[in-house]
Structure formats: C-alpha cells, structure tokens
UniProtKB/Swiss-Prot annotation:
Stored PROSITE patterns: COMPLEX1_ND1_1, COMPLEX1_ND1_2
Chain's gene name: nuoH
Protein family membership: Belongs to the complex I subunit 1 family.
UniProt xrefs under HAMAP family: NDH1_NuoH
Annotated EC: 7.1.1.-
Keyword Translocase set for record: yes
Subcellular location: Cell inner membrane
Parts of the chain that traverse the membrane: 16-36, 86-106, 119-139, 165-185, 191-211, 254-274, 276-296, 315-335
The protein's name in its UniProt record: NADH-quinone oxidoreductase subunit H
Job description of the protein: NDH-1 shuttles electrons from NADH, via FMN and iron-sulfur (Fe-S) centers, to quinones in the respiratory chain. The immediate electron acceptor for the enzyme in this species is believed to be ubiquinone. Couples the redox reaction to proton translocation (for every two electrons transferred, four hydrogen ions are translocated across the cytoplasmic membrane), and thus conserves the redox energy in a proton gradient. This subunit may bind ubiquinone.
Signal sequence bounds: none
Location (main, coarse): membrane
Keywords: Cell inner membrane, Cell membrane, Membrane, NAD, Quinone, Translocase, Transmembrane, Transmembrane helix, Ubiquinone
UniProt GO molecular function: NADH dehydrogenase activity; oxidoreductase activity, acting on NAD(P)H, quinone or similar compound as acceptor; quinone binding
C-alpha cells in the first residue's frame, strides 16, 4: 500500500506534503492557544479585580473566544477613504505572517523542530526586528494622526528594547557556544540558565513586555491619549490579524524565555524520571511566563513615554552590556568558554 501511494506522486511532492502537514501541526495549535490566551487573560484579570470574567458563552465561558472570533469575522472591513489601501490591508497580514513564521525554529521537544538550523537565534532576532514594519505601515497608511503617532511610538519602543534583548542573547550564547536553539536547551541539562543569569532573566521578561507592547509598556495603544494607537482605523478581520499577531508574539516571548532560561523541554526539580513528554513541560513553562505577563498587566500602571525610553537606554542597555562583559570575563578567566580548540 505504501509503495502504491509512493508511486502515485513524485518524491518531492511527498516531501512538500510532509512539510505542509508539519506547518499545520504547529499553526493550528498556536491559533487555538492564542484564542484561549485571550480567555485566560480576561479570567485572570477578572479574578484580580474580584470579577468573574467571561462566564456566559459555553460552560465557564469556554466558548467566548469562538464568539469573539465569529463577531470579528462577520463584521464589515471599513477602509478609510484617504488611506493607502494596499499598505493598509498589507500591514496586518505582514504582522500576522511574521508572528507565525518565527515558530519554525522553536524546538518543542528533543528533535521536534520544523527547521533545525544552526542560526536559529539569529533567525528569531531578525523576524522580531521585522515586526515593527507592520505597525509603522499601519500607522502611516491609515492617514490618521493618532494611528501615525502610535506607529512612531511603537517603532521607537521596539527598537530601544531590541538592543538590550540582543546583548542578553549574546550573554546566553557565550555560555552555550552555539546559535542553535536545541543546543541552548541541552546545555541546561545540569543547571538552568536562570540560576547564573538571573538578572538577565528579569531584564528579558521586562524587555519582552516592551517588545510585545504589553502593559505597563503599551504606549502604542495608549487609549487614554491616542484613542487606540496604530490600529485605531482597523476593524473586523484586519483588526483580528493584529490581535492574533500580538498574542502570538506574546507566546513566542514565553517560548524564548523558556528556551533561554528555563531549560526548554527539560523537566524541573529532577523530575525527568516521570513519564511526562518534554512537550508538556515546555507548554507548562510557557503558561507560567504568560501568567506573569497577565499578572503584570493587572498590577502596574502605564509608564510615561520619557520614563519608558529612559529605562530602555539608561538602565537596561548599560546593565545588559555590563553583564555581557562580566560573563565573557568569567568564562575566559576560568577556562569555561565552550567549544575551545
């Protein structure tokens, strides 16, 4: 039977089909996770504000994400008369596409990675740097001063904190000696990097909040002053694509935190003997980081814009650079640099 099926189509078609199935196996659970992250956010923040959160649609409100998605799907997409239509529609598509393609190099378990490339960290850094273009395009194409100001704020914010994230990544990579994300995880078999690099872990979490435009760094969407920021003119599915892209980027930041500092798919506290797949541990760690993101949103007030810039350039950048020099010095002094000779 297998030989018959193989003979029906050329080998390259089968390879293409396998790749498509692998992509679907990543994208479909990711979209479901994004949908239920919105539900979890409303439940967690509701509990912190002594409310119930969504509890009407389905048991315990579990069908609320489906209702929200259906609502956005059936609404009309309104295009502003003075907008550049091609760029206006292309911006949310670009944001959503970049949020998805970043997951190609994420190792979910040992050997469970779509593209196991040797420069996985550089790939992720490049994709995250491109994300700002979608927001700038949206702000400019809307032909609205509120959207344009939101886009400019977002560009400045993301670029500012990407510099610190870059130095944090270099410090971790010096400890590993490889740009491959699977190697980063296996290097933590004896000790997770959260122990030697704990200050970097805190910096990475806070920089991740700023990079994904989450509270208390949600200046681009400052509804108190900019109505809704760069997406003020968007509605229906174009708005939904921005929404999905933002939450997919949040999950990506959780996955990166898990891989760089929390041992990726490895079991915590010496529980590796339990018959629990590495994928489950990886997902649980992402959920833990997401809870921190939601907790911060419910707890802290929004930063003023000058405070945000000062924190990025005058605190995070010098400290991450100092830690990079310290890491390199310690590794060199004790002969701990990996892959020597």
């Amino acid at each position: 039977m297998v030989d018959l099926l193989t003979g029906l189509l050329p080998p390259f078609v089968w390879r293409l089909l396998i790749i498509v199935l692998q992509i679907v196996a990543i994208v479909l659970p990711l979209l479901i996770a994004v949908a239920y992250l919105t539900y979890a956010e409303r439940k967690v923040i509701g509990a912190m504000q002594l409310r119930k959160g969504p509890n009407v649609v389905g048991p315990f409100g579990l069908l609320q994400p489906m209702a929200d998605g259906l609502k956005l799907f059936v609404k009309e997409t309104v295009l502003p008369t003075s907008a550049n239509r091609v760029v206006f529609v292309g911006a949310p598509m670009l944001t959503f596409f970049l949020a998805l393609v970043a997951w190609a190099v994420i190792p979910f378990d040992k050997g469970w990675v779509l593209a196991d490339i040797n420069v996985g960290v550089l790939y992720l850094f490049a994709i995250s740097s491109l994300g700002v273009y979608g927001i700038i395009m949206a702000g400019w194409a809307s032909n609205s001063k509120y959207a344009f100001l939101g886009g400019l704020r977002s560009a400045a914010q993301m670029v500012s904190y990407e510099v610190s994230i870059g130095f944090i990544l270099i410090s971790v990579l010096l400890t590993v000696g490889s740009l491959n994300l699977s190697d980063v995880v296996t290097a933590q078999s004896k000790m997770w990097f959260i122990v030697p690099h704990f200050p970097l872990f805190i910096l990475f979490i806070i920089s991740g909040l700023a990079e994904t435009n989450r509270a208390p760094f949600d200046l681009p969407e400052a509804e108190a002053e900019l109505v809704a920021g760069y997406n003020v003119e968007y509605s229906a599915m174009t708005f939904a694509l921005f929404f999905l892209g933002e939450y997919a980027n949040m999950l990506m930041m959780g996955a990166m935190t898990s891989i760089l500092f929390l041992g990726g798919w490895m079991a915590p506290f010496g529980l590796g003997w339990l018959p629990i797949p590495g994928l489950i541990w990886f997902v649980l760690k992402i959920c833990l980081v997401m809870f921190v993101f939601l907790w911060v949103r419910a707890t802290f007030p929004r930063y003023r814009y000058d405070q945000l810039m000062r924190l990025g350039w005058k605190v995070f950048l010098p400290f991450s650079l100092f830690w990079l020099v310290l890491t390199a010095s310690v590794l060199t002094a004790f002969g701990w640099l990996p892959n020597q000779g």
